[in-house]
Amino acid sequence: MKKILLVCAALFAAGAAQAKVTLPKIFSDGMVMQQNSQANIWGHATANKVVKINVSWNKTTYTVKSDQQGKWSFSLDTPAAGGPHTITMNDGERTVLKNILMGEVWICSGQSNMEMPMKGFKNQPIENAVQDILHATDPQLRLFTIKRNSTFTPVDTVTGKWQEANPASVREFSATAYYFGKELRQNLGVPVGLIVTAWGGSACEAWMRADWLKAFPDAKIPASPADIKSKNRTPTALYNGMLHPIVGYTMRGVIWYQGEDNVTRYPTYANMMTAMVNGWRNVWKQGEFPFYYCQIAPYDYKLIKYTINSAFLREQQMLAEKKISNCGMAVLMDAGLEYGIHPRKKNIAGLRLALLALNKTYGIKGITSESARYKDVTFKGDTAVVSFERADMWIYGENGYKSDLFEVAGDDHVFHPAKAWIERSKVYVKSEEVPHPVAVRYAFKDWAQGDLFSDGLPISSFRTDNWTE
């Protein structure tokens, strides 16, 4: 009996020593690889064994040697958009990846307004979803959703699978990401791969490493797994479980829709978001890749017991746009929902993110991608004159040459509704209640349906003062 056990143990050990090449789930059949790049691929094999990698697009065989733990990594020169292709890996036993496309790859991250699927949430639909899901079939649009995972230490793989876009897969996929990818497909004419790593209600801090959070002492880093009281809000927990495993997956850029959870902690958001983006760029080692994000949409946050005006968080997102290189912000002042934190118009969110990518990353001319932005204010007697930048097509109101969302205040810091009229790229603001204005605010509230535009895009809420309230 003992001899039989020893023989079985020896056979098991021999089998373990000759492990087949295995890959993280992100590398699997149906994947999209970034075209015209040196695309990273990594996995496990037999320890200290040469792994041969054959690629179908150039009939070349590459070799890489695994380390003592069996880990290996390699960068493949990828061709222009097209496919399908195959990759075969062999360390004595073959592993084959099939139906691979070359195209444009984007990471899509954030909280619930990124996670929200095309089918919507219960009682919370996506506008036009029924017909858009019906017409969603596109074999060259590939989707990968990373399953929620909150961990104390970084993990090496994720749960998910690559799927072609069709009504069944798109119904369960991020609406914001889908509409973004759909626009890229239609305008670039190449395969597109979308990787969604998002968790509703998640904090910005959760998507960051501990060393990036040193400048933010209020972010309490967990010292043990027991310290993860909130899976989606604990600092570092989602970076460890949902981002770290795909760091290095060669891609074009990132889209981000987050901020609602940070409203009550708004003063640090611009700096924190900047630190997060810089951190992601440092670990990805792809230089200053594009980072485009949605400004949170207006919503009455008092419904969820927030006492902080969310316009302060929108202001922080405006500041972040100036701090972060190679970025852009999609303004959603006209696409909110007063009594719902999950706006229905995800087609608008996806379109405006796509405008940024198509214009700023892919160089498509003739489209406006960035909203006009508050520049400065001057006071002439009882009238404030507000100027804007990025307003080549001047300013207009939803109902003509006026806006109903301006307020002015004097030295008493009390704001009063004001008359606002538009002349070219300036807005003139005046209130009979404030003979000597010193500050102006536009739509600076939790909920406001933005009514100020330039060249088809809404202008963010803003203020000219720096008062605490």
Regions found by a protein language model. Give the residues of each.
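Bacterial Sec-dependent N-terminal signal peptides
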Residues: 1-22
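Cell-envelope and extracellular/periplasmic
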Residues: 20-469
